């Protein structure tokens, strides 16, 4: 176990102390790895928030409205007092 630890430590020290100055790429291929900000923006098009919603959001009261339309008493009350009041009077549950 000590031998393995010692070999790992020596390998790490050799890696840290090695001369890495010649590791930088040279030539025309090295410039292809990087691009300017303008070229990067052309590649990645961000979603614009101001273009409008893609799908309108559903009405949260639609299931309640459909249920109240099926009951004639609730439908009549909703025409007179509003959907929330009619639903509360008929079913006794707040929306």
From Swiss-Prot:
<dbReference type="GO" id="GO:0060348">
    <property type="term" value="P:bone development"/>
</dbReference>
<dbReference type="GO" id="GO:0031214">
    <property type="term" value="P:biomineral tissue development"/>
</dbReference>
<keyword id="KW-0479">Metal-binding</keyword>
<feature type="binding site">
    <location>
        <position position="75"/>
    </location>
    <ligand>
        <name>Ca(2+) 1</name>
    </ligand>
</feature>
<feature type="signal peptide">
    <location>
        <begin position="1"/>
        <end position="23"/>
    </location>
</feature>
<feature type="modified residue" description="4-carboxyglutamate">
    <location>
        <position position="66"/>
    </location>
</feature>
<dbReference type="InterPro" id="IPR035972">
    <property type="entry name" value="GLA-like_dom_SF"/>
</dbReference>
<dbReference type="GO" id="GO:0030500">
    <property type="term" value="P:regulation of bone mineralization"/>
</dbReference>
<feature type="binding site">
    <location>
        <position position="69"/>
    </location>
    <ligand>
        <name>Ca(2+) 2</name>
    </ligand>
</feature>
<dbReference type="InterPro" id="IPR000294">
    <property type="entry name" value="GLA_domain"/>
</dbReference>
<feature type="binding site">
    <location>
        <position position="69"/>
    </location>
    <ligand>
        <name>Ca(2+) 1</name>
    </ligand>
</feature>
<keyword id="KW-0165">Cleavage on pair of basic residues</keyword>
<comment type="function">
    <text>Binds strongly to apatite and calcium.</text>
</comment>
<keyword id="KW-1015">Disulfide bond</keyword>
<feature type="disulfide bond">
    <location>
        <begin position="68"/>
        <end position="74"/>
    </location>
</feature>
<feature type="binding site">
    <location>
        <position position="62"/>
    </location>
    <ligand>
        <name>Ca(2+) 3</name>
    </ligand>
</feature>
<comment type="similarity">
    <text>Belongs to the osteocalcin/matrix Gla protein family.</text>
</comment>
<protein>
    <recommendedName>
        <fullName>Osteocalcin-related protein</fullName>
    </recommendedName>
</protein>
<keyword id="KW-0091">Biomineralization</keyword>
<dbReference type="GO" id="GO:1900076">
    <property type="term" value="P:regulation of cellular response to insulin stimulus"/>
</dbReference>
<keyword id="KW-0732">Signal</keyword>
<dbReference type="GO" id="GO:0005509">
    <property type="term" value="F:calcium ion binding"/>
</dbReference>
<dbReference type="InterPro" id="IPR002384">
    <property type="entry name" value="Osteocalcin/MGP"/>
</dbReference>
<feature type="binding site">
    <location>
        <position position="66"/>
    </location>
    <ligand>
        <name>Ca(2+) 2</name>
    </ligand>
</feature>
<feature type="domain" description="Gla">
    <location>
        <begin position="46"/>
        <end position="92"/>
    </location>
</feature>
<dbReference type="InterPro" id="IPR039176">
    <property type="entry name" value="Osteocalcin"/>
</dbReference>
<feature type="modified residue" description="4-carboxyglutamate">
    <location>
        <position position="69"/>
    </location>
</feature>
<keyword id="KW-0964">Secreted</keyword>
<dbReference type="GO" id="GO:0005576">
    <property type="term" value="C:extracellular region"/>
</dbReference>
<dbReference type="GO" id="GO:0032571">
    <property type="term" value="P:response to vitamin K"/>
</dbReference>
<keyword id="KW-0106">Calcium</keyword>
<feature type="propeptide">
    <location>
        <begin position="24"/>
        <end position="49"/>
    </location>
</feature>
<keyword id="KW-0301">Gamma-carboxyglutamic acid</keyword>
């Amino acid at each position: 176990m000590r031998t393995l630890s010692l070999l790992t430590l020596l390998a790490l020290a050799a890696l840290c102390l090695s001369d890495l100055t010649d590791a930088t790429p040279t030539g025309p291929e090295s410039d292809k790895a990087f691009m300017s900000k303008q070229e990067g923006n052309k590649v990645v098009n961000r979603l614009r928030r101001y273009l409008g919603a893609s799908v309108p959001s559903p009405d949260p009261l639609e299931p309640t409205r459909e249920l109240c339309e099926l009951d004639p008493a609730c439908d009549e009350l909703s025409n007179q007092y509003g959907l929330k009041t009619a639903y509360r009077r008929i079913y006794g549950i707040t929306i």
